[in-house]
């Protein structure tokens, strides 16, 4: 009788591990990655909002899409990833002391790496974007808020 319960428990444990159920160590790594993503986005926002860069009105005329629904799960990071290439191109339009192309590329590569790690093997999610677009500063602010929300739910 107990054998069946034990075997059921083992089977369930193996199924959870095989399907990537979060463990305490993976949650700790996820928290570190979310925190790192948050810091990278905040640093990028600081550079975009720099008064010297605000003079470059072209950079602030481009529109970015944000998810239609409130982004609340790590799978929503796919939406950030899809708009990141455009953001990189826009930031490269206005090179300055604060936004040199090499720093932008390094920053974007780091953000992409973190997002891909946080997404894991989830590829089936399709982003649905809001009809209303936002400027670069609001775009970054929305994703910073997303990271803060995810981080606070994990602590």
UniProtKB/Swiss-Prot annotation:
Localization per Swiss-Prot or TrEMBL: Secreted
Cysteines paired by S-S bonds: 79-127
Major subcellular location class: secreted
Native organism taxonomy: Eukaryota, Metazoa, Chordata, Craniata, Vertebrata
Biological process, per Gene Ontology: adaptive immune response; positive regulation of biosynthetic process
GO terms under cellular component: extracellular space
Function: Cytokine produced by activated CD4-positive helper T-cells and to a lesser extend activated CD8-positive T-cells and natural killer (NK) cells that plays pivotal roles in the immune response and tolerance. Binds to a receptor complex composed of either the high-affinity trimeric IL-2R (IL2RA/CD25, IL2RB/CD122 and IL2RG/CD132) or the low-affinity dimeric IL-2R (IL2RB and IL2RG). Interaction with the receptor leads to oligomerization and conformation changes in the IL-2R subunits resulting in downstream signaling starting with phosphorylation of JAK1 and JAK3.
GO MF annotations in UniProt: cytokine activity; growth factor activity; interleukin-2 receptor binding
Highest taxon in the source lineage: Eukaryota
SUPFAM superfamilies tied to this protein: 4-helical cytokines
Signal peptide (from-to): 1-20
Name assigned to this protein: Interleukin-2
Residues the record marks as carrying a glycan: 23
Keyword vocabulary terms for this entry: Adaptive immunity, Cytokine, Disulfide bond, Glycoprotein, Growth factor, Immunity, Secreted, Signal
Family from the record: Belongs to the IL-2 family.
